């Protein structure tokens, strides 16, 4: 096994991803492709102090620019399973050339080594060394039974956004109902969401938990990716909370316990969810939680340049994400804190329409509670919403166990939770599987158009390229049932 060595090190000015200020960081570029940044210069290259930034330069792209400052360079690389861009500047053109040459050399040497370990790495705290192209090759496929769009009846539109739409469908052969997420390849590729989309598919395939949405099929057409998923028709918690304004502590405890159970399972498989928000917390027909991610932005389709600015809804971003620090499982406990605060207090813990002010609040403002909130609930929320992920409830090595052992959950039998033995505090009043009363009628009242306008349907020269991004994108859960 090759010993990892430091190829280049030194100070760089790194531009914040969310708060656009320049921060000095001491970076080490290593022979294994890791590119790690510290607030202070490490006393020894092998010191165990956790870095603030941790990227991989494998398969990276580099670009020189003189904006917004002279001697700037941009690295496009992989962090976790998302393609990201990070901007740096140095004091002279020569220094910039040295960094670019060193990074390119490491990237090239990794390419020559060829594929090593499994192409998808979900380990917490470190970026995946796999390249985007390798991820595409792994894509998704266990079954060869050909599933097509003709196998379904299309009943109602459930949601719509930047990348596509979600439709309630009925499988013709079985009469079963599913939610079909239809994503446009053109948009996924244009917005660098290929890695994220393939990751989502693999996570859905490999997870089996009562409070996580199961994937039944995944297939593609020449211009679409289609996920056929378990359908939960009890509506999302955003829908219910916006009508009821606040939940009782008992109701919030029930939902919180089911979310904790699902996060414990995901973390045990080295998956960090990263996107806990009310819109992603669905209820099934009995009132149990189903965590989903339809991958649709709430704002709908927009051509604005801000689309790519946020990975996740800004109000839910954890302080360590805003500060461009490397993050781990604790981001999910922050997300849990935000949604449970909303449930019990009827508002977000931090809110401002001005994003810069919002970020200041998330980073600096102390959490405040309404007088009506009980002491156990206050203690839980204060613990989950600690700014420092190491001090946060759930941020320690025992992860979910810390949260489960908090006195707010004292009455909860966790075995009963996962076995769905607890009685849901609210049972959706649905009369049939096609009853969509808990979905926004802004969508459900619309007629369904599977074929979008010509400018999206006619892909021309992009078509072949898109097939190379998503080879073997097919999956059927039936072989595992």
UniProtKB/Swiss-Prot annotation:
List the GO cellular component terms.
Answer: cell cortex; cytoplasm; cytosol; early endosome; insulin-responsive compartment; nucleoplasm; nucleus; plasma membrane
Which cysteines does the record link by disulfide bonds? 60-77
PTM comment text:
Phosphorylation on Thr-309 and Ser-474 is required for full activity. Phosphorylation of the activation loop at Thr-309 by PDPK1/PDK1 is a prerequisite for full activation. Phosphorylated and activated by PDPK1/PDK1 in the presence of phosphatidylinositol 3,4,5-trisphosphate. Phosphorylation by mTORC2 in response to growth factors plays a key role in AKT1 activation: mTORC2 phosphorylates different sites depending on the context, such as Ser-474 or Ser-478, thereby facilitating subsequent phosphorylation of the activation loop by PDPK1/PDK1. Ubiquitinated; undergoes both 'Lys-48'- and 'Lys-63'-linked polyubiquitination. TRAF6-induced 'Lys-63'-linked AKT2 ubiquitination. When fully phosphorylated and translocated into the nucleus, undergoes 'Lys-48'-polyubiquitination catalyzed by TTC3, leading to its degradation by the proteasome.
Subcellular location field: Cytoplasm; Nucleus; Cell membrane; Early endosome
Under InterPro entries, the record lists: AGC-kinase_C, Akt2, Kinase-like_dom_sf, PH-like_dom_sf, PH_domain, PH_PKB, Pkinase_C, Prot_kinase_dom
Q: Where is the AGC-kinase C-terminal domain?
A: 410-481
Expressed in which tissues: Expressed in adipocytes and hepatocytes (at protein level). Expressed at low levels in skeletal muscle (at protein level).
Record-annotated Protein kinase domain positions: 152-409
What catalytic reaction does the record list?
A: L-seryl-[protein] + ATP = O-phospho-L-seryl-[protein] + ADP + H(+); L-threonyl-[protein] + ATP = O-phospho-L-threonyl-[protein] + ADP + H(+)
Q: Describe the protein's quaternary organization and the partners it interacts with.
A: Interacts with BTBD10. Interacts with KCTD20. Interacts (via PH domain) with MTCP1, TCL1A and TCL1B; this interaction may facilitate AKT2 oligomerization and phosphorylation, hence increasing kinase activity. Interacts with PHB2; this interaction may be important for myogenic differentiation. Interacts (when phosphorylated) with CLIP3; this interaction promotes cell membrane localization. Interacts with WDFY2 (via WD repeats 1-3).
Question: So what EC number does this one have?
Answer: 2.7.11.1
**What does the UniProt record note about how this protein's activity is regulated?**
Phosphorylation at Thr-309 (in the kinase domain) and Ser-474 (in the C-terminal regulatory region) is required for full activation. In adipocytes and hepatocytes, the activation is induced by insulin. AKT2 phosphorylation of PKP1 is induced by insulin.
- Species of the source: Rattus norvegicus
Residues of this chain annotated as glycosylated in UniProt: 128, 131, 306, 313, 474
What is the name of the protein in this document? Answer: RAC-beta serine/threonine-protein kinase
